[in-house]
């Protein structure tokens, strides 16, 4: 009996010992155990489309910062970072004050230390206790959010002359206790979806989509972006701490489309965001794809990403729906594009439809598309590109040299395509990107032609480019379609705008055409690709020796003023996989022709007080005879430069080789849009007797092939050197825009090179790649987040 009582007492003592006598049998201390932060535990993690947030009490903010400083310290460095905010941004974190006191800690799902745990995002954070220095003396908290299956990055905008309509996926509920969605206009007026008619809105709620229609006259806000007026619908859906954007921008109502179509995309997240946030977040465009065309211009400012496309590539027409008396037509267009921001996990898909007012005929609706704009914005920063994919070994690269950024708006050069009847047409691309004065970025890319792809068969993979700002090296990169009037959908084109990326690739199926052409009084010009006149380059050493004794302003050697005419003969031996080209060497024009050009306004005289940007375009193409005297392959370099002539080449003429295509070339006046007297003094090429007139001294030089260098590959460089008074003519060839081409409202004046429809301007190119290195922008484009 006494034994059982002793057992009972022993059990009781063992139970009460830790509470009554802690000093008798000490157990493990609780000091080293992490304790949850009492203030943080009362708050709940809020999950949004791209990030999760947690409200931190003021008493724990310093402890959280101490932990962040420790985990974000560089490896091997014992010093704490001086600028914590910059490190937080790079790591996908954000710590900012809240309305009701305390702070809001936000972490992107793609941020540092965020792990994917089954179907959840998980982040473990710690908050040091006051005065603690060891990790064991910290409070731990785990942030966890489920992965959202619904893709909310889609928006469709329909711009009608009388209303604006926005369609978006229906936002999912994050929890069972979420309040119903309400309409918020300008962040002030709030109404339920059932009372939307009181605000003048029409709401259509489907199974997966929500469509809201607003009249243009009442609720829209007028806004100026790049000297362009817009009508903005500042509409949001709000519920508790969540907000869902229905903002959309449409151009002003017009009956005649302009030369370019601009799509304005707000720089904001399209998913669920935190409502009422004071954060002004900066989103960085990284990737862009336009579905309908491969020629477009990209720019951005603080609030918008602007994509501009030539009107002729998108415009369509339809009969007016309300036309009763007259059969009028209504012009419209549709643009589908994808835009990816560096701070978002998935790209946004944007669709814009715009309908113009009805007009009497199709010609009236498209009249303004052939008229270039007169108002141009300020200059923009230069971009360069590097190939992201390895081009074929047989395709020579098209190199774009660096040019310094000028304070004055630089001239931009648009490179247009020219068709060639080869089985596999080699391509080269240009892309023009400049920097506006406000720190925006402009990118013009047109890598391929849909008309050429129809002849080529299967399309090549879509082009991709990583573009990043470079404050000092603008590069010229652009190209145009072969048929300007073609408005059908074309292949997709990708432009990547990576702030930290240093590589890009542009694959284009377009050949170069660098020399303009004008009509003249001679016989009609019919060019054939079958006859071939083989002309070799005059060696630079030989020409320099002849130039040393020739009189001033004379493009020919002294004592040899006679001319010889070389008649072309039909080529009897076909060249496999490569057509025969008509090659002719153009001597310099006469002063009388210069005077006529000056009277016609086709020559630009640069201001001597301002520096002029002079681009250099180098194209590499094999000669007609692909093997030199040594039997090794010979490559030909063509250098078309508008810079001042060097001392040794001061008096030499242009000795570049050009090729022409086999079809009737249209009159350039059809593009100019005005009746202009034809210029005289132009060389003529007929079909019966195709002739190339050269100087006797030059013919003597062409009969000899220069010796190949020891490296094996013969490299000939043909750089046009302008005699006195001719540098303005060279500038006119590259800086005189044709009225048939349109100017971007986002870039400075662009001088258009002639397209493939003009005679004598086909420069055989190859599938090219362009290289560059870009630096990230220092400007901060921030957008308020509701």
UniProtKB/Swiss-Prot annotation:
Sorted alphabetically, the Gene Ontology cellular component annotations on this record are: extracellular region
Q: What is the reported phenotype of gene knockout?
A: ENU-induced null mutation in mice produce heterotaxy.
Q: Does the record carry NADP as a key word?
A: no
Record carries keyword Acyltransferase: no
Q: Which Pfam families match?
A: DUF4556 (PF15094), ZP1_ZP4_Ig-like (PF22821)
Tissue specificity comment = Expressed specifically by cells of the ciliated left-right organizer.
Question: Could you name the domain of life of the organism this protein comes from?
Answer: Eukaryota
Q: Which UniProt keywords apply?
A: Signal
In the UniProt record, the signal sequence range is 1-18
Give the GO terms filed under biological process for this record.
Answer: determination of left/right symmetry; heart development
Question: Which PANTHER family does the entry mention?
Answer: GENE 572-RELATED
Q: What is its biological role?
A: Plays a role in left-right patterning process.
The protein here is known as Ciliated left-right organizer ZP-N domains-containing protein
The gene for this chain is: Ciroz
